[in-house]
Amino acid sequence: MSSYNYLNEKIILPISDTLLGNSIYKDLKFLMNSQWWSADELKEYQNEKLRALIKHSYDNVPYYNELFHSLHLTPEDIKTSKDLYKLPILTKDILRENIKNGKIIAKNISKKSLLLGSSSGSTGEPLQYYNTRDAESFNKACAIRGWYWMGYRLGDRYIKLSQNPRPLLKNIQDKFNNCFYISVQQLTDENFREIVEKINNFKPLFIRSYPDPMLFLTNYIIKNHIQIITPRAIATTGNILFDEYREKIENVFKCKIFDSYSCEGGANVSECETHNCYHSSMEYAITEILDNDMNDVENGCLGRVITTDLHNYAVPFIRYDTQDYIKKSKEKCNCGRELLAIDKIEGRDSDILITPSNKWLIVHNFTGYFEWIDSVEQFQV
């Protein structure tokens, strides 16, 4: 760790936490230790957090109090993650309705302290919900830990490519974080030329982006025979990173991609340095991977992601249906971490076709087929 990295992690981050009321530094320090816990230690931590969450939800959240009574359950009936099957799945529609009527918002948390969060809306109407400062800090710390797996340290020079407008506070934070933010709202050849110029001039150690803009930028570089600097790594998130995308981007930038996935409700997953799998942040949420009958899938199988956020006490997400599918790893990762190992992020339920014989076809199946047919420029299933 350089002196500049040390300054950012050990001094600037704690000062920022104090000024903004966050706890990212404390949480990151905890997570850098807990990532090496045994599976039993991780599950024990989850169960302890789950019991506290269930009691809080029963005592302070009308929706869950009514739900428990209707099921003739008490908080004592949910002692470990294995007991979660006793509770129904929380769908986005149920959540949206009960946020609107206020029944799923905790009564014992000041409205002034609530933070507004929102899903991307990629599958329809965005979901707006509330979060606590502590939960948001823990989530950010999990994301930073994932970046650390690719060799990043706070203060390292990086470029972020994104479509979102950058508010003043974010611009100020970018300066402190050594981040050069580049908007990719308009993807034209002229914009790509400017982006390449900015990347080459800034010489980032890391690049963060959605997969699609990185692919389009890569295609532009290939088409125009342009020289591009080689960062240490590229971090992608936000939509599916197809194998052919990864291969093409890595070949052009001559570095590895570290993919990640997150979703409202506690899903926070990052690819580790072995590139053999992703790891779910078990300290942040309980992740169930279920089949169509809502039973646990076997290792190596595809399943629906159901999450229980162990930290958001404002609007508890308990057995939340993310509508995403992931493939559970067959084996433990050889990185040594016993965090839940995931082979692939497969996409939304709207991206999966189930045949009459109950065979699941994901977007990858069609992409891999049509990429070899030159006459097909675009396709939609």
Task: List each language-model region with its residue ranges.
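Short, solvent-exposed polar/charged micro-motifs at secondary-structure junctions
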Residues: 86-90, 167-169, 268-271
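Conserved AMP-binding loop of ANL adenylate-forming enzymes
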Residues: 144-186
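Nucleotide 5′-phosphate-binding alpha/beta core
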Residues: 1-118, 125-139, 144-149, 153-156, ...
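Conformational gate/switch positions in structured elements
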Residues: 123-125, 154, 263, 325
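Active-site glycine/GP-rich loop and adjacent strand/helix microenvironment
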Residues: 2-12, 16-41, 48, 52-55, ...
